[in-house]
Curated annotation (Swiss-Prot):
This is Small ribosomal subunit protein uS10. Signal peptide: none annotated. The gene is rpsJ. One of its GO terms (biological process) is translation. InterPro entries: Ribosomal_uS10, Ribosomal_uS10_CS, Ribosomal_uS10_dom, Ribosomal_uS10_dom_sf.
Length: 103
């Protein structure tokens, strides 16, 4: 797999889970002899929702909720065959969304 690059994008609501997963990926890639760039923190997406607390009147009484989506980017520049096999066998947390692209 010469002159290839593996780009891994991670998304999660919990920043502790995403940091733990990135550490596992980086440690696995370095252990198998690949060159790693990252983890690069991407902008956090904040979704805010405003809900009326009263079912009928009192429009002034509202609750506000927020969901934060944390994102990280990892580039593995020169992956070996061992690296690809180790990443395929890696078991990450259930709350982390992983997108892998070859380039």
């Amino acid at each position: 797999m010469q002159n290839q690059r593996i780009r891994i994008r991670l998304k999660a609501f919990d920043y502790k889970l995403i940091d733990q997963s990135t550490a596992e990926i980086v440690e696995t890639a370095k252990r198998t002899g690949a060159q790693v760039r990252g983890p690069i923190p991407l902008p956090t997406r904040k979704e805010r929702f405003t809900v009326l607390t009263s079912p009928h009147v009192n429009k002034d009484a509202r609750d506000q909720y927020e969901i934060r989506t944390h994102k990280r980017l990892i580039d593995i520049v020169e992956p070996t065959d061992k690296t690809v096999d180790a990443l395929m066998r890696l078991d990450l947390a259930a709350g982390v969304d992983v997108q892998i692209s070859l380039g």
